[in-house]
Amino acid sequence: MTDTVQLAKKYFELSNKGKLTEIKKLFTSSSTYSSANKDIFLGSDQIMDMQTKFFSGFDTLGWNVHNIKEVKPGIVLFDFTFTGITLDGEVVQRSGKEYVIVYNGKIQHVEVSNKD
């Protein structure tokens, strides 16, 4: 397993544990994050503000990763299913694809899209 895949997997593992402080260390001030369900964010501060708000809307949440593949050097593709229970008790489930781009040992970009 390449260092790129290991770092990308670590990002998902930390997300499933809700370890936002540790997740922030994986990004830089020039990292970007784009999601079909959100917006686009620049830098670890903006990314983590978004993630903090996202996580705070759920009692429980997690990503079940079905497939991981380094599609090109430095680019890892995850197929996943997200499941969460909101603070109102609503069950949210969606399948998606997530590209994690790693450069110089940090996450440079995350691109999340719905599978449909």
Where are the regions a protein language model picked out?
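Histidine kinase transmitter module recognition
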Residues: 14-15, 57
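Short beta-edge strand/loop motif at the mouth of beta-sheet-based domains
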Residues: 42-46
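Short, well-ordered alpha-helical segments enriched in acidic and aromatic residues
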Residues: 7, 17-30
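Short histidine/acidic/glycine/proline-rich micro-motifs that form metal-
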Residues: 37-40
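A beta-strand edge to alpha-helix "cap/lid" segment located at domain peripheries
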Residues: 3, 34, 48-116
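Amphipathic alpha-helical repeat scaffolds
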Residues: 9-13
